[in-house]
């Protein structure tokens, strides 16, 4: 059934929709299935995402029609064989405020703008490319309670432009028992700032939380005494049940508090698999604790290889609305994860109060920033190029292999990361860097050959 007479109005202008502030706007890439018209399918998406049914129903009234989602712009040839561009305006009244406080929730918003429309049979691809949240909605999402300035404060740095936080993931990601896990933490903390659990590290029988966390808390205290520097740990509290997440969080904070280090703790939540409910549980139950959003599994909906799902930029915006203090953004083409240089807009959208996306100019109206967390195949040699592309180093970076694969020690690996940042910031020649960074060339010769050809001769190292 062609519903374009009701669910499309191409006379609407984006300028007026934005100025009125009564709609959430979404840009999609759409490829209709064979035998279907572009506007016909676009209108079906708007109908399926709002008030529509596959037939006319007698219960529809004038108010219902007043909250129809409307297609307001199309360009059938925008992406060639991959499909065309369409934009839909969703009335704010369609979205769901909480009973307890009137805040909007991402779960409902997501189910509406990228829910049943993903399973429609009359398209071969429907991908969300960008969306614009109006002021009246932005101000009623939780947003972050803490941000990177809170971590800089713990580290004794300026709370504005406090710089790069050198971190790692304990490797191997699974299989370490409590004692070697805590030792690995201590060894890295002698040179680096920040350690996170990897996404599957939690409460396995071979490394129970109630055994390993006390040892990690003690290792942090020893490392701080040995170095005279504050250290940070991001503990995985992900679980299916909100009470279990809270139990884990309270336990972790209690163990680190024995050394006065509860402010040195972040909570890692696997936000894709546990969903907005898990993220919000941590955000609201522990508003003083940095909320570290790990996106494991996100590629199922964000991979550029898919005609479905959403672009990573949309996922970043959803995470900020949920209240993530920091989220993994990938490595923008400099590590092992799927991505490209222009993904620096992901970081800008997270950290700035206003940012131009691919289709919409988003204002955040004072919402706290979300930190870009850079992870996945990075090491000291890859960092200068990454910083140059991004334009700053106010990020958390976790290098697992890039730290524990350093030829000298995990501590040297951590030191080399900080030296890479200092080298980029001062414009120093990497080949002439201090020892730990210089030894990274020998630690990761494959990267060195690609990024710094001729390094062997300059350092006097031969194959």
From Swiss-Prot:
The EC number(s) this enzyme carries: 4.1.1.39
The protein's required cofactors: Mg(2+)
Keywords: Calvin cycle, Carbon dioxide fixation, Lyase, Magnesium, Metal-binding, Monooxygenase, Oxidoreductase
Any one of the GO BP annotations: reductive pentose-phosphate cycle
Binding site for substrate: 116, 173, 295, 328, 375
Annotated active site: 171 (proton acceptor), 294 (proton acceptor)
Keyword flag rRNA-binding: no
PROSITE patterns hit by this protein: RUBISCO_LARGE
Keyword Magnesium annotated: yes
Reaction equations catalysed: 2 (2R)-3-phosphoglycerate + 2 H(+) = D-ribulose 1,5-bisphosphate + CO2 + H2O; D-ribulose 1,5-bisphosphate + O2 = 2-phosphoglycolate + (2R)-3-phosphoglycerate + 2 H(+)
Site (Transition state stabilizer) location in chain: 336
Residues with PTM N6-carboxylysine: 196
Pfam families (alphabetical): RuBisCO_large, RuBisCO_large_N
Annotated cofactor note: Binds 1 Mg(2+) ion per subunit.
Induction field: mRNA expression is constant at all CO(2) concentrations tested, however more protein accumulates at 15% and 2% CO(2) than at 0.15% and 0.03% CO(2) (at protein level).
InterPro entries the record matches: RuBisCO, RuBisCo_large_chain_AS, RuBisCO_lsu_C, RuBisCO_lsu_C_sf, RuBisCO_lsu_fd_N, RuBisCO_lsu_N_sf, RuBisCO_lsuII
Miscellaneous remark of the record: The basic functional RuBisCO is composed of a large chain homodimer in a 'head-to-tail' conformation. In contrast to form I RuBisCO, the form II RuBisCO are composed solely of large subunits.
Database matches in NCBIfam families: PRK13475.1 (NF010002)
Family to which this protein belongs: Belongs to the RuBisCO large chain family. Type II subfamily.
Assembly: Homodimer.
Function: RuBisCO catalyzes two reactions: the carboxylation of D-ribulose 1,5-bisphosphate, the primary event in carbon dioxide fixation, as well as the oxidative fragmentation of the pentose substrate. Both reactions occur simultaneously and in competition at the same active site.
Name of the protein this chain belongs to: Ribulose bisphosphate carboxylase
Organism from which the protein derives: Hydrogenovibrio marinus
The gene coding this protein: cbbM
């Amino acid at each position: 059934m062609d519903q374009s007479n009701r669910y499309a109005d191409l006379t609407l202008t984006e300028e007026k929709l934005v100025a009125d502030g009564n709609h959430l706007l979404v840009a999609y890439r759409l490829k209709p299935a064979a035998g279907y018209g572009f506007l016909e399918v676009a209108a079906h998406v708007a109908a399926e995402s709002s008030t529509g049914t596959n037939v006319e129903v007698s219960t529809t009234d004038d108010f219902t029609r007043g909250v129809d989602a409307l297609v307001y712009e199309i360009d059938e040839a925008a992406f060639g064989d991959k499909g065309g561009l369409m934009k839909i305006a969703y009335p704010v009244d369609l979205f769901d405020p909480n009973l307890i406080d009137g805040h909007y929730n991402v779960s409902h918003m997501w189910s509406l703008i990228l829910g049943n429309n993903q399973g429609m049979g009359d398209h071969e691809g429907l991908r969300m490319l960008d969306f614009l949240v109006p002021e009246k909605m932005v101000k009623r999402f939780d947003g972050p309670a803490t941000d990177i300035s809170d971590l800089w404060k713990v580290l004794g740095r300026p709370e504005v432009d406090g710089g790069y936080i050198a971190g790692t993931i304990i490797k191997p990601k699974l299989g370490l028992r409590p004692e070697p896990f805590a030792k690995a933490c201590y060894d890295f903390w002698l040179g680096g700032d920040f350690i996170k659990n990897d996404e599957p590290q939690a409460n396995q029988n071979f490394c129970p939380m109630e055994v390993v966390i006390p040892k990690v808390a003690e290792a942090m205290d020893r490392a701080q005494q040995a170095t005279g520097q504050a250290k940070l740990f991001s503990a995985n509290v992900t679980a299916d049940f909100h009470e279990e997440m809270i139990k884990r969080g309270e336990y972790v904070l209690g163990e680190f508090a024995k050394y006065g280090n509860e402010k040195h703790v972040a909570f890692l939540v696997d936000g894709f698999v546990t969903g907005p409910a898990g993220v919000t549980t941590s955000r609201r139950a522990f508003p003083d604790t940095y909320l570290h959003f790990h996106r494991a599994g996100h590629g199922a909906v964000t991979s550029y290889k898919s005609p479905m799902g959403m672009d990573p930029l949309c996922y970043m915006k959803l995470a900020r609305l949920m209240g993530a203090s920091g989220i993994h953004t990938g490595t923008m083409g400099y590590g092992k994860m799927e991505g490209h240089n222009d993904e620096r807009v992901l970081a800008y959208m997270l950290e700035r109060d206003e940012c131009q996306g691919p289709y919409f100019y988003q204002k955040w109206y004072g919402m706290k920033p979300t930190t870009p967390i850079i992870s996945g195949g990075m090491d000291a040699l890859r960092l200068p190029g990454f910083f140059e592309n991004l334009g700053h180093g106010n990020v958390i970076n976790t290098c697992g292999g890039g730290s524990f694969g350093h030829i000298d020690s995990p501590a040297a690996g951590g030191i080399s990361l900080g030296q890479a940042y200092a080298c980029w910031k001062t414009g120093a020649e990497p080949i002439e860097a201090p020892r730990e960074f210089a030894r990274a060339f020998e630690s990761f010769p494959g990267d060195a050959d690609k990024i710094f050809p001729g390094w062997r001769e300059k350092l006097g190292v031969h194959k």
